[in-house]
Amino acid sequence: MPGHKSSTEDYFREFRRNTVGINQEYSTPYGIKKIIYCDWIASGRMYGPIERKMAGTFGPFVGNTHTETSETGSLMTWAYHHAQEKIKRHVNAGPDDVLIAAGAGMTAVINKFQRILGLKGCSYPRTSRCLSDTDRPVVFITHIEHHSNQTSWYETLADVVMLEPGRDLTVDPDSLQKALDKYKDRKFKIGSFSACSNVTGVFTPYHRLARLMHENGGLCFIDFAASAPYVDINMHPAEAIEKLDAIFFSPHKFLGGPGSSGIMVFDKSLYKSTAPDQPGGGTVDWTNPWGEYKYVDSIESREDGGTPGFLQVIRAALAIELKEMMGTENIRVRDEELVERAFEGLTAIDGLHILAPGIRKRLGAVSFYIDGLHYNLVVKLLSDRYGIQVRGGCACAGTYGHFLLDVTYDHSHRITEMINNGDLSEKPGWVRLSLHPTMTGEELETVIRALREIRENGSAWSADYTYNRRTNEFRHRDDNGQGMERVKSWFNLQS
């Protein structure tokens, strides 16, 4: 009920209090506003106790890894390995699973994994000069994928097959079975699926998809980027046929996670490489002046060339520790409360349309559009007038957007032709509201009220802004660039 404070809201009060920036204010053309952060699926927020732990406990002993002789080197090496083991336990990795960290999120690790699998090694990708049809890998994806789990596969040797959407645009295992039947002669079959949509928060039955892949001689990889901060991850469920052969996620999306690296965990039997993806320091047992050398046997060490991102992985492990402290069951209950209230409030606003409106069992992601108002104008008005931080656009899920917004082939090509000519004004999109268990009921009521007022007054308020067709952004007429000058000042260590 509006204004009602639940027991789970009380439970998350301390976690909220420790979130860096929870009371941060900033200046807008309409006065000073307090940040109400609703962009969690894009990135998490820093957490005070983790920042203090990084600076006060780990910081004084920071030194390069790859040694267990010096005090700093040995402590950081041990801390790095302990962090890796902690992450593995969290996802119920098995003794034959290995962990590799790379880059800043899931995009980096899935591309690295594709290279490790040898899927980007042919000079003639996606042509008959490289592989026969039966030898060419086939990768099955769904219509809800983030671009990272879609476009990255297009740049491999594999044929990429998008499964037909099920009822209400859900992911239907029957569609996978039909595709597997069609490609039954392929020797190398991969299913790479999102655990959850980053647009609508709708879950996929990924263990059922894993079962089908394994029953048909394939492999199953799962992208947990959107859902990892909120749900249990189990690579090895009770039924072995539903195991996950590889998982990817972005710890920066966790509370306390910004600044961490991308994480993947996979079955070591998939590793066939004779050389690491990035040869370098720490990847060899020995070299000599005659061009001879030997790479280390450990896959995790071999694929961790150079100085590893040990602080990034330590931070990821601490963010996971925080998630475990909050408890996934508590998170689920609070998410359900917030989603239910968001649906009640938003569906009552005339002209506001929620995407995937028939599915309320979802992660805390509610995307919508408002008749007659550009999605980026709505985002700008929420920020300038109310302090509410959301995201507008296609959320790096443009293909899903075609289905959600019923964009036809001809319409799509008219839009893409305009985009190719530098005009983004017809690019479809929506506003994404990300809910988080630390969010209060009062904050959510503010969001609902703000959207109601924007629906009523947005057209008039738009007169304060100019629109740039090339960037698809709105700028307030009184914006004099002071924000950029403020950011520059942040880099002055003497102030």
Explain the meaning of each model-derived region.
Residues 1-495:
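Pyridoxal 5′-phosphate
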